[in-house]
């Protein structure tokens, strides 16, 4: 097993925490963005921000 310095371990921990933060707070907005980019299925009304907020 590779021995890492204390500084390297701290940097890796910060990197993983940053990755977790990005995944937790970025997943839903990414899905919403991709849904808007693709558009509605044929025969369905176009999605709007208001329709997302009010169902």
UniProtKB/Swiss-Prot annotation:
GO biological process: positive regulation of protein targeting to mitochondrion; positive regulation of type 2 mitophagy; protein import into mitochondrial matrix; regulation of protein stability
Mitochondrial intermembrane side: 37-55
Claim: Transcription regulation is one of the keywords in the record: no
One annotated Gene Ontology cellular component of this protein: mitochondrial outer membrane translocase complex
Principal subcellular localisation of the protein: mitochondrion
Keyword terms: Membrane, Mitochondrion, Mitochondrion outer membrane, Protein transport, Transmembrane, Transmembrane helix, Transport
Subcellular location: Mitochondrion outer membrane
Topological relation to the membrane, as annotated: Single-pass membrane protein
InterPro entries linked: Tom7 (IPR012621)
Keyword Mitochondrion: yes
Pfam families in the cross-refs: Tom7 (PF08038)
Cytoplasmic membrane side: 1-20
Parts of the chain that traverse the membrane: 21-36
Family: Belongs to the Tom7 family.
Function: Required for assembly and stability of the TOM complex. Positive regulator of PRKN translocation to damaged mitochondria. Acts probably by stabilizing PINK1 on the outer membrane of depolarized mitochondria.
Subunit relationships: Forms part of the preprotein translocase complex of the outer mitochondrial membrane (TOM complex) which consists of at least 7 different proteins (TOMM5, TOMM6, TOMM7, TOMM20, TOMM22, TOMM40 and TOMM70).
Identification of the protein by name: Mitochondrial import receptor subunit TOM7 homolog
Organism: Sus scrofa (Pig)
